[in-house]
UniProtKB/Swiss-Prot annotation:
It is found in: Cytoplasm. The active site is at 89 (proton donor/acceptor), 151 (schiff-base intermediate with acetaldehyde), 180 (proton donor/acceptor). HAMAP family: DeoC_type1. The lineage of its organism: Bacteria, Bacillati, Bacillota, Bacilli, Lactobacillales. Pathway: Carbohydrate degradation; 2-deoxy-D-ribose 1-phosphate degradation; D-glyceraldehyde 3-phosphate and acetaldehyde from 2-deoxy-alpha-D-ribose 1-phosphate: step 2/2. Belongs to the DeoC/FbaB aldolase family. DeoC type 1 subfamily. PANTHER family: DEOXYRIBOSE-PHOSPHATE ALDOLASE (PTHR10889:SF1). It comes from Streptococcus sanguinis (strain SK36). One of its GO terms (cellular component) is cytoplasm. Catalyzes a reversible aldol reaction between acetaldehyde and D-glyceraldehyde 3-phosphate to generate 2-deoxy-D-ribose 5-phosphate. It catalyses: 2-deoxy-D-ribose 5-phosphate = D-glyceraldehyde 3-phosphate + acetaldehyde. This is Deoxyribose-phosphate aldolase. One of its GO terms (molecular function) is deoxyribose-phosphate aldolase activity.
């Protein structure tokens, strides 16, 4: 198992400086992580720095609330890809899901999938705000809308991934769709537990600590 290729090396804090982003990029190149996950303002800088490597630039869409309109999310997606993003992580319309407005949730996801035009799309459910029934429904809608992955969390709400949620998501989507655990992986043991539960990608700021077999401080 190539653990490094499970990791989306992440820095989404609004106060992140160019120096910190550059450090993230250099670490990702050293460890050959799957991607770095950075805010859209850093796409072009990151894409330039990562030229010649296998590390992709992953960008959040409708982040962190998921409450933008579908048109805005679609524009963000096209803009991100045009600027060099190789993957996008969109946040669902959580309020619509809570309201059982499933058509809107599905249309919202589909708008991003269509705008991505083949670029990998991960759908953030924000599991800490959902019941198990809502988590299952969100997974089904993401799958129906043609997304590539379902993802637990933004890291900006009340909690991150749990092993139980990852297992539920994997059980719901079956073997062929990706599942990303984000927030909560602070050590090698954490990462392994998520992978054993069914995760195929892990979003974390602790990628280096995980690879070194250490435990990182912080909460994402």
């Amino acid at each position: 198992m190539k653990l490094n290729k499970y990791i989306d090396h992440t820095l989404l804090k609004p106060e992140a400086s160019e120096e910190q982003i550059l450090k993230l990029i250099e670490e990702a190149k050293v460890y050959d992580f799957a991607s770095i996950c950075v805010n859209p303002t850093w796409i072009e800088f990151a894409a330039e720095q990562l030229k010649g490597s296998d590390v992709k630039v992953c960008v959040p869409i409708g982040f962190p609330l998921g409450a933008n309109t579908s048109d805005v999310k679609a524009f963000e997606t096209k803009d991100a890809i045009q600027k060099g993003a190789g993957e996008v992580d969109m946040v669902i319309n959580v309020g619509a899901l809570k309201s059982k407005n499933y058509d809107l949730v599905e249309r919202d996801i589909r708008a991003v999938v269509e705008a991505a035009n083949g670029t990998l799309v991960k759908v953030i459910l924000e599991t800490c705000l959902l019941t198990d029934e809502e988590k299952v429904k969100a997974c089904q809608l993401a799958q129906k809308a043609g997304a590539d992955f379902v993802k637990t969390s933004t890291g900006f709400s009340t909690g991150g991934a749990t092993v139980e949620d990852v297992a539920l998501m994997r059980k719901t989507v079956g073997p062929d769709m990706g599942v990303k655990a984000s927030g909560g992986a602070r050590s090698y043991e954490d990462a392994l537990a998520f992978i054993e539960a069914g995760a195929t990608r892990i979003g974390t700021s602790a990628g280096v600590a995980i690879m070194k077999g250490e435990e990182a401080s912080g909460d994402y």
